């Protein structure tokens, strides 16, 4: 069947494509991906910009008519928890925002995700657009490995009653709902109080998220091979409100002081949890990781230098 159809016969291998919408070069790249997989006998599902409100937040996918190519067989699917079921992987064309949207679908189906950066920094992507053909050839030959990245499980309690649940790959950002005044919180680690302070918010991050919002807030960069939890206060009014790195098995709790402002918890900037004044946020290592496709063994330091364009002129160390 031609592009835009939803009745394509199931193939032995099938891949879900999630692409950033609205840019002609990405649409053209997506069609190129479809043709390569078609020649390799790999089925392609294409996410369209519909929403399944039962699980997945609104997700900008390609419009169905953007992918119409005569002779190219694709299956059009809507965003939802079942969008990637039965697929070998989720392939992402775009930047970090598109990757985080795709990670929701990949995690729901317990399959890996591969990012091709067509955005700006694209820290979460495995490779760049100029290496697309080589990356797809490795996928066709199954020449990739899967790396598990830790996630966060997040819940909100009011008087011991759980009122909200969520998860994050990068970070859970606890923020003041009001832009007036500060959010008064008490930080707890492993059942013990650590510090109380007024702040704009508190970030709890994974190593993967240490190069994202937590980095902008002054947190350390943590190598992804290291499992840990990061706690980064944002604009805290306190002598001791430094970033903390805890055990991956720690329970991090942030209690909002009764009578303070209401807050919100943003999970990866995509999923929002309500945080009434006097409520408690608890964050632990997630039960379900995000499975990450790796195509090479390049050191994380090289990726960091390249993505952040760090100056290394004058280095005289040993070349690999």
UniProtKB/Swiss-Prot annotation:
Q: Which domain of life is it from?
A: Bacteria
Active site location: 96 (proton acceptor)
GO CC annotations?
A: cytoplasm
Keyword S-adenosyl-L-methionine attached: no
Name the UniProt key words of this record, in alphabetical order: ATP-binding, Cytoplasm, Kinase, NAD, NADP, Nucleotide-binding, Transferase
Q: Which InterPro entries match?
A: ATP-NAD_kinase_N, ATP-NAD_kinase_PpnK-typ_C, NAD/diacylglycerol_kinase_sf, NADK
A molecular-function term among this protein's GO annotations? NAD+ kinase activity
The signal sequence is none
Which cofactor(s) does the record list?
a divalent metal cation
Q: Where in the cell is it found?
A: Cytoplasm
Q: What top-level class of enzyme does the UniProt entry assign?
A: transferase
Sites where the protein binds NAD(+): 96-97, 101, 170-171, 200, 211-216
Gene Ontology terms: biological process: NAD metabolic process; NADP biosynthetic process
* Pfam families documented for this protein: NAD_kinase (PF01513), NAD_kinase_C (PF20143)
EC code(s) of this entry: 2.7.1.23
User: What reaction is this protein's catalytic activity?
Assistant: NAD(+) + ATP = ADP + NADP(+) + H(+)
Q: What does this protein do?
A: Involved in the regulation of the intracellular balance of NAD and NADP, and is a key enzyme in the biosynthesis of NADP. Catalyzes specifically the phosphorylation on 2'-hydroxyl of the adenosine moiety of NAD to yield NADP.
Family affiliation:
Belongs to the NAD kinase family.
This chain belongs to the protein called: NAD kinase
Gene source species: Rhodococcus jostii (strain RHA1)
Q: What is the lineage of its organism?
A: Bacteria, Bacillati, Actinomycetota, Actinomycetes, Mycobacteriales
């Amino acid at each position: 069947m031609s592009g835009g159809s939803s009745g394509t016969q199931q193939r032995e291998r099938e891949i879900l494509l999630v692409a950033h919408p609205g840019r002609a070069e990405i649409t053209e790249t997506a069609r190129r991906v479809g043709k390569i997989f078609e020649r390799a006998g790999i089925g392609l599902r294409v996410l369209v910009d519909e929403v399944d409100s039962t699980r997945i937040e609104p997700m900008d996918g390609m419009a169905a008519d953007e992918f119409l190519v005569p002779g190219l067989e694709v299956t059009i699917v809507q965003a939802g928890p079942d969008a990637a079921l039965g697929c070998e992987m989720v392939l992402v064309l775009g930047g970090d925002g598109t990757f985080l949207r795709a990670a929701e679908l990949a995690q729901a189906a317990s399959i890996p995700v591969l990012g091709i950066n067509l955005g700006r920094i694209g820290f979460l992507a495995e490779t760049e657009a100029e290496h697309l053909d080589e990356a797809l050839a490795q996928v066709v030959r199954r020449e990739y490995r899967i790396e598990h990245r830790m996630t966060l499980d997040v819940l909100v309690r009011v008087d011991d009653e759980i009122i909200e649940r969520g998860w994050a790959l990068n970070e859970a950002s606890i923020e003041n709902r009001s832009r007036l005044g500060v959010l008064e919180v008490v930080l707890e680690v492993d059942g013990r109080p650590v510090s109380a302070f007024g702040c704009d918010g508190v970030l709890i991050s994974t190593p993967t998220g240490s190069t994202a919002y937590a980095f902008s807030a002054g947190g350390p960069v943590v190598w992804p091979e290291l499992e840990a939890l990061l706690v980064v206060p944002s604009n805290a009014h306190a002598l001791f409100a430094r970033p903390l790195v805890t055990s991956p098995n720690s329970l991090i709790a942030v209690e909002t002081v009764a009578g303070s402002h209401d807050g919100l918890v943003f999970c990866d900037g995509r999923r929002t949890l309500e945080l009434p004044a006097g409520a408690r946020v608890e964050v632990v290592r997630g039960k379900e990781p995000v499975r990450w496709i790796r195509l090479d063994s390049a050191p994380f330091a090289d990726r960091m230098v390249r993505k952040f364009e760090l100056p290394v002129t004058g280095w005289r160390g040993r070349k690999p």
